[in-house]
Amino acid sequence: MATTAILKNARLSAQKGRLVADQVRGLPVDKALDILGFSPKKASALIRKVLESAIANAEHNDGADIDELRVAAIMVNEGPTIKRIRARARGRASRVFKRSCHIKVMVSED
């Protein structure tokens, strides 16, 4: 039985989130948590929190055994982009894009 957890509108670009997500896709959850714990990237803390939530959902809602869980799927999709203006020289302005993403983690038993 696959169980999911979703974090929406995380203040992180999807491109940077996918770098970390690719490292833990398909791994057992205990090994994935170890990798995320030692990664220095901002995305690793967010993905770790969502993964822990998915594990708790699987244990509570489905009665799954934690030792048998694997990261079945992990998706980092683009969320809404906030557009801001940065003042530049000679009275000009340039756009600043504050990107966000949606992180979805799916765990299942072997």
Swiss-Prot record:
The keyword rRNA processing does not apply. The keyword NAD does not apply. One of its GO terms (cellular component) is cytosolic large ribosomal subunit. Pfam families: Ribosomal_L22. Keywords: Ribonucleoprotein, Ribosomal protein, RNA-binding, rRNA-binding. Disulfide bonds: none annotated. Coiled coil: none annotated. GO terms for molecular function: rRNA binding; structural constituent of ribosome. Gene3D superfamilies: Ribosomal protein L22/L17. GO terms for biological process: translation. This protein binds specifically to 23S rRNA; its binding is stimulated by other ribosomal proteins, e.g. L4, L17, and L20. It is important during the early stages of 50S assembly. It makes multiple contacts with different domains of the 23S rRNA in the assembled 50S subunit and ribosome. The globular domain of the protein is located near the polypeptide exit tunnel on the outside of the subunit, while an extended beta-hairpin is found that lines the wall of the exit tunnel in the center of the 70S ribosome. Belongs to the universal ribosomal protein uL22 family. Part of the 50S ribosomal subunit. This is Large ribosomal subunit protein uL22. The lineage of its organism: Bacteria, Pseudomonadati, Pseudomonadota, Gammaproteobacteria, Chromatiales. The gene is rplV.
